[in-house]
Amino acid sequence: MNSHSPSKFTDRVVSAVPALVLLAAVLLPAPQPANAIPAFARKYGLPCSACHIGWPELNNFGQVFRDNGYQMMNERDSPITRDPSYFPITIRITPQWHRESANNQIVDNSPGNGEGGSHPGTLSTSGFDLSGMDIWFAGTLYKNISFSALPSSDQNASFHFENAFVRFDNLLHTPWLNFKVGKFELDLPVSEKRLLTMSGDGGFYYIYHFTPLNDANPFGGIGDNQLGMELAGHNANSYTRYTFAALSSLDGNPGLVLSNGNPANPAGRTFDYYGHFEQGFNTFGNGFMKVGAYSYFGFAPTFFQTSNGVPIYGRGNKPFYRAGAEWKWYFNKWLVKSVYLHGYDNAFLANGVPSNTGTLSATQRAAKWNGGFLEGQYIISPQWIIIARWETIHMSQQADISITPGDTGNLNAFTIANRWYPFMFSRAGLALQQEYSFVRSNGVTNQGGGFGTLCTDAGRAFNCTISSSSLFFGIDFDF
């Protein structure tokens, strides 16, 4: 691939990376030509901006490429036509400095002595750190047979398969029939795996993973990758898209258990189902819009069949669902995304009551909640993006109204980030990111930044407010 040569300014930036980490919050980035994600750039010779709003987020052309099974629908698609030295792999990791803080936490009166009483207080910590590492293999095995395998580790190099699937594309010579089997991300309204924000409190979508207080449903949320099969289709420009997936009720875990290697949580021998429909259209000089709807419906066990006291498989399965809608608007340098979700867990799941023990009390009910997010991105150039997001979740019905106040678990979160790419070439890319996120929740911690407690555990009333924040400076790179 003929890529653009780095300018002298870019060379100086690369040589001065340590100083840039400290100065990144006030740097004024100079626009540079942006190229592609390495693996596919080397294969097709296209600039990164052809497929990406900003790596790793896709634009509509990139969505079409992905929907086609990582194919441009030309003579370069089959790997047999590529140079033998071509290998479809990308490695990504993020060295970083971050600070995490939360109030109304349990603080021992005498440090090191948990028996000497405690009081509510604020806990903070900061320092240099690493993200996990992704080793991503993806491409085509043959014309119209694509694959992805993504071994992913945490900060301590403990690996798991984030995804691993094979997809048969354009069945019966039509883009409306594509079949995938394995472990994969659901076709969500907004992909969490391509999220640009990375901080402890801002590096995920809360509504994709929310579980009410004391809820026993083992389902981790629609943001978790799942094991199963998917039928999907789209028109030529992916303005009209659909997916339907049938999934094992394992929350993405292998081995027919709900927790990796934990025999105490076997699967419920049921299937879950997910569907998503999306329609895009031009708005006559006002950009491009997409609207859509989605739903996840499943069952989870409330007790287990045992053998000599050892749980073998789940029984007493009860239903739950997540359903909602989306709206996205691409206009000039702006991208606005919004997602709404309504959640429901059956009363037995929500209260952790085995369904073979009798009836529920008069105060025990199904858990219901509503939430979502609104995110805006200002795309100054393909190398410089500013992101802001507001998220909210509100309980509409608690599982047990006799003990849990109605607003317990409600949250509001705000995240703002600045992401600048000094370079992105066909062999490697680098992004400097500065980010701040803030979360307020009622009664119970819903944050992701490293602290967690109930207000009552910290000696406060159930209706206290827990606030947490994350400050993040990172160097996100792939090659």
Predicted regions and their residues:
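Short cysteine/histidine-rich metal-coordination sites, predominantly Zn2+-binding motifs
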Residues: 61-75
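The canonical Cys-X-X-Cys-His
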Residues: 45-55
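Sequence/structural segment immediately N-terminal to covalent heme-attachment motifs in c-type
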Residues: 37-47
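Outer membrane beta-barrel
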Residues: 59, 89-110, 120-252, 269-274, ...
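Short Fe-S-cluster ligation motifs
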Residues: 74-94
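Outer-membrane beta-barrel pore domains
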Residues: 165-168, 172, 285-479
